[in-house]
Amino acid sequence: MPTPEKLATDATVAIMLADGFEEVEALAVADVLYRAGVRSDLISVTDARHVTSSHGIRVVADLMLEDVDLSTYTVLFLPGGMPGTLGLKGTPAIQAEVLRRGW
């Protein structure tokens, strides 16, 4: 996502994408965050920046999971959708970060 010209907060949001994600849950949230002046990144947990939604829509993520440190984000957002949620659940880096945060 492009960074808003004027940030309203120092908070950052990692929007995690796995193949089969629900595009409305992921992209509507990204849009609202952008309009609110909150920096968010679409992060692919697959082996490519292109991620396919549960309805076959291809989205290009901003970053690959292997290139980020999830602990630097204020919030992790895990959108629903099948089988996307299973892809997120099965990602060791997400599991570790959720446990580190005590969720």
Question: Where are the predicted features?
Answer:
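Extended, subdomain-level signal for the structured scaffold at the beginning of enzyme domains
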Residues: M1-W103
